Amino acid sequence: NCYIFNWGQEGQELLESANPGADFGLKMVLDIDQKEYIPFLQSTAAARIILHQQRSFPFLKDLGIYAMPGTETSIAVLEDQTQHLEAPYSSCTVDGSDIPVANIYSKFNSSYSIQSCLRSCFQEIMVKYCKCAYYLFPLLNGAHYCNNQEDPDWVPCYYNIWDTVSHREQCINMCQQPCNDSNYKMTISMADWPSAAAEDWIFHVLSYEKDTSLDITVNRDGIMRLNIYFEEFNYRSISESPTTNVVWLLSNLGGQFGFWMGGSVLCIIEFGE
């Protein structure tokens, strides 16, 4: 299961933190319910977490971090904002509209990112050469997901595309970084939770809250506590600026021209005298 907190979509009100610090952040108790795990499909028992901007698609598998059961995990967050210069100083994109790849994640009302562009590009190549779409990525318009009945050769075709360096380079060259981007730096600390002195009553309360009609027992192998908060409200802003623009270039050329032209005129006058 995947849950998004403070997504801000579909008219949902965004929640704001009043102050920095652990007392003013998000606090959760999670139960990963290992009894529901399917053998051979999942060998890791944990919750995977990612912090991202509103309207950015969360690529949890690639960018997430793990939180262990039986622990209290505190995540202190700092934000870095990066602003790149647009053309002609760089090849960054403002909103992805100038990228020759159709964003298959736009149907989720999500903004442009390099990850979404790379996956969209791969899906286009998959549909072009294998005649079907990869089942873990959203569908392109007019395409269908690969299946063994209609596309018996899709598996070797998929691995051939995945292992071909030229296809990856093609997508990397087309997918440019956004001109404005935000990253979240996380400081993570963990401690055993609950403590030996408190585990009896905590497990009893959590078992009761989970289901009052069934005899369900919560234990250390399935629960964890999460604290996510801003370390401080200040953020670091990294912005690019041109060392020389057209105005400065013309000004410098004019100054140099005037200096050397004036010196030349003086030399000619002195030589004439």
From Swiss-Prot:
It is a multi-pass membrane protein. Disulfide bonds join C92-C179, C117-C175, C121-C171, C130-C157, C132-C146. Signal peptide: none annotated. Keywords: Cell membrane, Cytoplasmic vesicle, Disulfide bond, Ion channel, Ion transport, Membrane, Sodium, Sodium channel, Sodium transport, Transmembrane, Transmembrane helix, Transport. GO terms for biological process: multicellular organismal-level water homeostasis; sodium ion homeostasis; sodium ion transmembrane transport. PROSITE patterns: ASC (PS01206). It is found in: Apical cell membrane; Cytoplasmic vesicle membrane. It comes from the Eukaryota. The chain crosses the membrane at residues 246-273. Its main location: membrane. GO terms for molecular function: ligand-gated sodium channel activity. InterPro entries: ENaC (IPR001873), ENaC_chordates (IPR004724), ENaC_CS (IPR020903). NCBIfam families: ENaC. This is Epithelial sodium channel subunit beta.
